[in-house]
Amino acid sequence: MPTRKISIPPGYLKADMHCHTYHSGLTGHMEAFEPMDCYSSPQALYDLAKKRGMDLVTITDHDSIDGCLAFLEKNPDAPDFFIGEEVTVQVSEFKTNVHVAVYDIDEKQHREITHLKGNFDDAIAYLRTNNIIHALNHLFHGFHPAKQGYAFLEKMISSFQLLEGLNGAINRGHNSITQRLGELFPGKSLIAGSDSHTLLRLGTCFTACKAANKTQFLQQLQSGNTLIGGKYGHFHHLFNDAMGVYLNYFRDLAFRREVHVNWPFWKEIRNGAGWFVCLPVFFSGALGGLFVQQCIERFRQVKYEELIAALSTGEGLDQTIVDPEFVSTTR
């Protein structure tokens, strides 16, 4: 299995900077049965992350900090936990969304970010003004490089100091492209996270900073003094995640009753039976859909490589693209 192996020097702390719980909400697939995007609980995620060697823990649910707040309600004095969120921000000029990870925020900041996420420029301006740690997750996810590729890259590169250079759900080729961007442009640093939607891959990717405690770790992260390591994604990781969600749906209905606890009995029977009957469809659909997705992404990867090659030879973006105001406020 492809791995980015690094030797962590003494005095460094590690954290998986991208992971989810059931507070990420509903998935966009098989909506009639209302499956969640993830079935991991905040406490289970924390416990397993610590068991797998993470010194610090965060949760980055989609557009929600409810999982973080639920954990802190039960563990108010946890010295090794900080609030995170993966915010879906609209970039209207490219007719796409990007996922922006934000860290060490409070409830008021979450509400402000939620209010601004419909406008990329306003959201980034708020994050900079308030000195909030933020990173661009999986840079090329959902954006076709043939559609204003240079312009999109220019906007993203000028907007972020931190880029997710290792995502555990993405193959080595795509991760390496972001890593090369981090090398091409001054002032850019990388973070890593498993992007786990089940507990299977939790902690398989990590960000390390030289620090003795959470406060120092976040300061180093803000300054871009990071190391990244872990396992690259593969087709079978995504398939395992999909099947994990399928099985955990049944587990919650039959035994745990933690996620779909408010469903009436008739709805549990209807959705559970429908979910079971759809197993062949789900299995073949997940297998086929993920295979097609991988083929498309491999084609796009070629286009990304062409963009990066042009950048490295000076044919594309100005390699000095850095926002001086941003650098001066975060380094």
Say what each PLM segment does.
Residues M1-K95, L200, G289-R331:
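An N-terminally biased module of ancient metal coordination in phosphate/nucleic-acid-related enzymes
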Residues H18, D61, F81, V102, ...:
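Divalent metal-coordination and catalytic microenvironments
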Residues G25-H29, L69, K95-V100, H144-F152, ...:
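Histidine/acidic-residue-rich catalytic or RNA/ligand-binding cores of hydrolases
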Residues T96-I133:
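Binuclear metal-dependent hydrolase catalytic cores centered on His/Asp/Glu-rich metal-binding motifs
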Residues K117-N130, K147-S158, G173-K188, A192:
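Histidine/acidic residue-rich metal-binding segments in metalloenzymes
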Residues Y150-R172, C209-Q219:
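Structural recognition of alpha->loop->beta junctions
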Residues G187-T204:
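Short acidic/histidine-rich active-site segments
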Residues K210-C278:
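A conserved mid-domain beta-alpha-beta active-site/ligand-binding segment of alpha/beta enzyme cores
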